[in-house]
Design a protein with these regions (language model features):
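Short alpha-helices
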Residues: 122-190, 326-327
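Active-site cofactor/cluster-binding pocket
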Residues: 73-134
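Hydrophobic helix-and-loop "lid/oligomerization" segment in the mid-to-C-terminal part
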Residues: 2-37, 41-72, 77, 92-93, ...
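A generic local secondary-structure boundary/capping motif
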Residues: 85-88, 105-109, 135-138, 156-158, ...
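An acidic intrinsically disordered interaction segment
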Residues: 1-18, 105-117, 139-144, 148
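Solvent-exposed alpha-helices and their adjacent loops that cap or buttress functional pockets
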Residues: 20-21, 88-91, 109-112, 127-129, ...
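Hydrophobic "anchor" residues on beta-strands that sit immediately upstream
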Residues: 28, 32, 96, 117, ...
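Acidic active-site catalytic centers that drive phospho-/nucleotidyl reactions
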Residues: 36-38, 100, 121, 174
């Protein structure tokens, strides 16, 4: 029931969904692997809704790891109850919810033989998602947490300070302070939640201490950067923290003259990818699908996307082969030919040479 914001009455949808949940057993909330602030905030918001409206607590399950220091601080400071999915006995749960991801996308660890009952997301609709009983996918929203915030408001549920802080930080980080893919519902929620959030907790989340490995990976990304005009490609090689690819993609998009960034890094048994752009004529979700076709899975939307190609072991040769494969596909798709890649140092020297000499 329900397939998008343009046809969805939120009050009716949540009323009927809660009535359906009320007559069933234990509830499981599944979020995507290596969770980010959006899915974390969405999960505790839905959990709070169930507590307040049907008097039932849900279990939040995730896979992978939370390695980005800001996300770790968020989970700790806001006391988000999380259970590794490996400890979950799926037979115990009568209701399965999925947030900020969809069945079959490859970025969540729900077993393929387990169906999803309640699905809430803001990414493009997958055909398999239409089989779920309760579906609310709003591609015109920048953040899944905004949808969950609207559920709470529509149902008249009180938001405590920690929940408000979680939802605010999710919108803040996902949209980069409303500057990336934020629409009116996201802006409205952001402004209302700001007044309810705990500013000291926000400071603790946004200014955590960073491990030395973080700086070593940043240094590796800087050294392995290749620039093709307005395109930048960086390879973090073998990574300690899977979330670094997304962080480095955002980081390098701030470089003057750069409009598109592909960041990659080897983790586990594959190569993780993150794509970021400021170009409105490109769709990052479609573009990254081209990159991984036949070798992995990916998902995303207008300005940001992520993915993984499988079977890339942690050897220099395999990592280099994967980089060449992805770079060649991207350059071909963008019709970038006969452009010799530059390093950051080479770019600096070229720009210094091209700049007109100032008279003293």
């Amino acid at each position: 029931m329900g397939f998008g914001s343009e046809n969805l009455d939120t009050k009716r949808f949540t009323d009927e969904m809660l009535d359906w949940v009320r007559g069933r057993g234990k509830i499981l909330i599944v979020i995507h692997d290596n969770p980010d602030p959006d899915c974390l905030a969405s999960a505790i918001a839905l959990r709070h809704l169930f507590v307040m409206k049907v008097n039932r607590e849900a279990t939040i399950a995730f896979s992978g790891m939370i390695s980005r220091s800001e996300n770790l601080a968020m989970a700790k400071e806001l006391e988000i109850p999380l259970t590794p999915i490996g400890f979950i006995n799926f037979r115990e749960f009568s209701v399965v919810c999925m947030l900020d991801t969809q069945p079959g996308t490859g970025n969540n660890s729900l077993p393929a033989d387990r169906s999803v009952d309640i699905l809430v997301d803001h990414h493009p609709m997958r055909e398999t998602s239409k089989k779920c009983r309760w579906v609310d996918i709003r591609e015109d929203y920048g953040v899944t947490a905004t949808i969950l915030y609207e559920y709470l408001v529509t149902q008249g549920v009180y938001l405590g300070t920690k929940l408000a802080t979680a939802l605010f930080y999710a919108i803040k980080s996902e949209t980069q302070d409303l500057g990336r893919e934020a629409n009116k519902p996201d802006r409205d929620a952001y402004l209302k939640l700001f007044t309810l959030s705990n500013k000291k907790l926000l400071y603790e989340i946004t200014h955590p201490k960073l491990p030395v490995e973080y700086f070593l990976m940043v240094n590796r990304a800087l050294e392995n950067t290749k620039i093709y005009g307005k395109l930048l490609i960086t390879n973090l090689a073998q990574m300690n923290f899977p979330e670094m690819v997304a962080e480095m993609a955002d980081f390098f998009l701030r470089l003057e003259g750069i409009e598109l960034v592909l960041a990659m890094g080897q983790y586990g048994d594959g190569m993780l990818l993150s794509l970021r752009t400021i170009r409105h004529d490109l769709n990052a979700g479609i573009l990254i699908g081209v990159l991984v076709e036949g070798r992995g899975n990916a998902g995303g939307h207008g300005m940001m996307a992520g993915g993984k190609i499988e079977n890339v072991p942690a050897s220099p040769e395999a990592i280099h082969e994967a980089e060449d494969f992805l770079a060649n596909r991207l350059l071909t798709e963008l019709n970038i030919i006969d452009i010799k890649p530059q390093t950051l140092q080479g770019l600096r020297e070229k720009r210094n040479f091209d700049e007109p000499k100032r008279e003293v």
